[in-house]
Amino acid sequence: MPSANPAPALHHERSVFDGWRSLVISLYMTLVGYGVLAGIPVISTAWATQLGFSDVQTGRVAGADLGGLALGAVLASLLVAQINRRLLVFLSALVAIAANALCMVLVDYEAVLWLRLLAGTGSGVYTAIAVANLGASSKPARAYNIMLFCFAFTQAGEMFALPRLSMDAIYGVFVAAYLFGLLFLRWVPPRPVEAGLDVEVELPDPELGTVVEHRHVPAAVPWLCLAAIAATYINIGAYWTYIELATARAALDKAWVSNVLVWVSFMSLLGCLVATVISNRFGLLRPLLVTLLAHATIVGMLAAGVTSMT
C-alpha cells in the first residue's frame, strides 16, 4: 500500500556531465588520482624496504603525498568555477607526471618528501575536477556508487600487483596512467552548466500529481560535509599508511597479510552494495553513523594490539 505522504525526491535534469564520455573519463581520472591513496600500504612498505626509509620518514612521505592530495583539492575548489577544467586537468597531470618521474631519479629522503608533496598536489587537483564532474551529473549518487565499485576493484588490483613491482615501476605505473588519461582530455566538459547550491525537489501534489519546488541550501551545509570528510580521511589515511608496516612489526606472515588486504578491498564491494540498498530505505545519516561507530571500534581493537585475529 503506497504511503500517504511519500518522501520528496530530488528533481534531476540532464546536463553535459551526464554524457557517457564525461562519466567514463571522470571515473578513470578519479581512480588514477586516488591511486596512491588506494595503494599506500604497499607503497609505504616499498619506501621502507626498497629506499631504506625509517617508519617516521615513511609516515612523513606518505603524509606529504596525502596532504598534497588535500591541498590540491582545496586549490581546485578555488579555481574550478573560473578556469577551463580541461586546462586544470592538463596542468595538474603534468605536475603529477613530472613529480613521479623525478622520484625515479632522486631517491634521498628530502627530495622524495618534497616530490611526493608536489605529486600529491597535482593528483589532488586532477582528482577534485573528476569528483566535481561526477557530482555535477543529474544523478550524483549513482555516479558515486559506480565510482566506489570501480575503486574497490582498483584497490584490490593495487594490493595484488604493486608488491611485485620495484619502486621505479610503481612510479612508472602512475606516470603511464596520467599520460593515458590525457589522450581523452577532450571528453572533460570545460565549464560547469551553472553555479549555486540550490536544488529542485519533486513533491507530491493531490491535483497535479507532482510539483517541482525550488529550495535553498545553506552555505554551511557543504562546509560541514567537507569537515566530516576531512576528519574521516585523516583517520583512514593514518590507519591505511601504517597497517602493513604494523603487521610486519607484529611478525605476521607477509603473504597472508597481502592476501587479507586484497580481500578487504574486495569486501568494500559488498559494503557499496549494502550502502546502496540501505540508503534507499533509511536515508544516508543513520547508516553513516553506524559505519563510523564500527570504524572507531575496529581502530580501537587495533590500538590494543595488532594480531592475526584483529
Which ranges hold each PLM region?
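Transmembrane alpha-helical segments of major facilitator superfamily
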Residues: 60-69, 258-268
